[in-house]
């Protein structure tokens, strides 16, 4: 970033475009690419953000080199199997050797999306990486190894808990109350972002 006025971002697991809308509300930021595995999400995002390149894909099934290099990687990995809102007991990320019960494929895939963050960051070496998820992600058994993997790539991090309904720095706050965790990574040696302003 170092003084550049052209800050680019990629929005992964983009949904309808709320994160993109937030990013482009910051002067100098543009979202170059957005991706999701669901065609309806891509259709909606494309309608809302026509100047962004859209890629319909399951990130685990494609190579990161298909995406443009950007300053920021924004990831909103699937949170269904981390969240208590699901209404079912969360499944452990590790399979017990003493149990015949195996986690469902959907649960494993949901948690595996967190590792797409590491894989894409390793390839693109973003200046900043933001990961938005539910607060329960902190109790995921592989949370610490996941953080350690990002540290091994040369990033420092800070964990921020925020209900977006109470955040209105750049405009109207979100119209719903949902607690979220934002794990913010920056390259070690670079100045840490100012999270207080």
Indicate where each model-derived feature is located.
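S-adenosyl-L-methionine
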Residues: 40-67
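Generic detector of well-ordered alpha-helical packing
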Residues: 12, 37, 59, 133-134
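Conserved beta-strand segments of alpha/beta enzyme cores
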Residues: 30-33, 53, 156-158
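Generic enzyme active-site microenvironment
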Residues: 9, 34, 74, 130-131
């Amino acid at each position: 970033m170092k003084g550049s006025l052209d800050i680019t971002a990629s929005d992964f697991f983009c949904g309808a475009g709320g994160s993109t809308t937030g990013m482009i509300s910051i002067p100098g930021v543009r979202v170059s690419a957005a991706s999701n595995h669901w065609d309806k999400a891509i259709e909606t995002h494309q309608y809302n953000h026509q100047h962004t390149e859209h890629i319909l894909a399951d990130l685990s099934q494609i190579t990161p080199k298909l995406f443009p290099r950007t300053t920021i990687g924004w990831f909103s990995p699937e949170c269904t199997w981390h969240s208590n809102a699901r209404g079912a007991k969360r499944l452990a990320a590790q399979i017990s050797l003493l149990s015949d019960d195996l986690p469902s494929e959907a649960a494993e895939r949901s948690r595996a999306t967190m590792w797409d963050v590491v894989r894409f960051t390793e390839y693109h070496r973003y200046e900043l990486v933001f990961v938005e998820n539910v607060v329960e992600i902190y109790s995921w058994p592989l949370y610490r190894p996941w953080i350690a993997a990002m540290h091994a790539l040369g990033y420092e991090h800070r964990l921020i808990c925020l209900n977006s309904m109470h955040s209105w720095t750049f405009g109207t706050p979100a119209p719903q109350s949902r607690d979220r965790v934002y794990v913010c990574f920056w390259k070690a040696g670079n100045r840490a972002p100012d999270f207080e302003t």
